[in-house]
Regions:
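A generic local secondary-structure boundary/capping motif
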Residues: 37-38, 88, 97-99, 143, ...
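Short loop/turn motifs enriched for small/polar and acidic residues
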Residues: 50-54, 101-103, 158
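C-terminal edge-of-domain segments
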Residues: 98-111
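Conserved S-adenosyl-L-methionine
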Residues: 132-193
């Protein structure tokens, strides 16, 4: 969870719930159902299947992948929490955005801990004209062999993204310090982190 606060060049941090072969919709359903959802999703959690991506796979209909994955999670939670099948689960608690990626017939199921992308640092209200994303500027600085004890020349000097990111690196300020994250509402995350 600290990774959301401190990683400068990442876009999102996801928890991998599991991976399994999925060449058919039945294999997808059984694979998602077999995962330990009760370790992540408390009773009442909202759990949209926010994204599905299929690449070089027999399964390629992404809306169907989302619908089948949602059905499998619902069935698993109904079983675990001893809820009747005909009664829908209440989804009025914290949100856990689930993503399903199928690459070469192997499904990977993840939960997004970040929420909005990590380039949104929270220090900028107006982006200015054509800025580089903050995480990209930080990545370029980290790869450029620049160190905080050396001068930094920013020839682009647009909206100041390179200079702001360099100052944050030099002063060891966490890039996620002034923003919120999806995981902050989860009951199993230590709030003192």
């Amino acid at each position: 969870i600290q990774t959301n606060l401190w990683l400068r060049a990442a876009d999102r941090i996801k928890i991998v719930v599991g991976s399994f072969p999925a060449k058919t919709f039945e294999e997808l359903f059984q694979g998602v159902f077999a995962l330990d959802w009760e370790n992540y999703l408390p009773l009442g959690a909202k759990f949209p299947i926010s994204k599905a991506k299929c690449v070089k796979s027999k399964l390629h209909n992404e809306p169907s992948v989302q619908a089948i994955s949602k059905k499998a999670v619902v069935k698993k939670l109904q079983k675990h929490y001893a809820r009747p099948e005909g009664v829908p689960l209440q989804e009025n608690g914290a949100e856990f955005r689930i993503e399903v990626s199928i690459l070469k017939d192997v499904a990977t199921v993840m939960i997004d801990t970040t929420g909005s992308s990590l380039f949104k640092r929270g220090y900028r209200a107006d982006k200015g004209g054509a800025p580089i994303k903050e995480n990209m500027a930080a990545a370029i600085l980290l790869l450029s062999n620049w160190y905080p004890d050396k001068p930094l020349i920013d020839p682009t000097c647009g909206s100041g993204t390179f200079c702001i990111e360099a100052a944050m690196i030099g002063m060891k300020i966490a890039p996620g310090l002034h923003r919120s994250f999806a995981f902050e509402d989860w009951n199993w995350v230590d709030k003192d982190l």
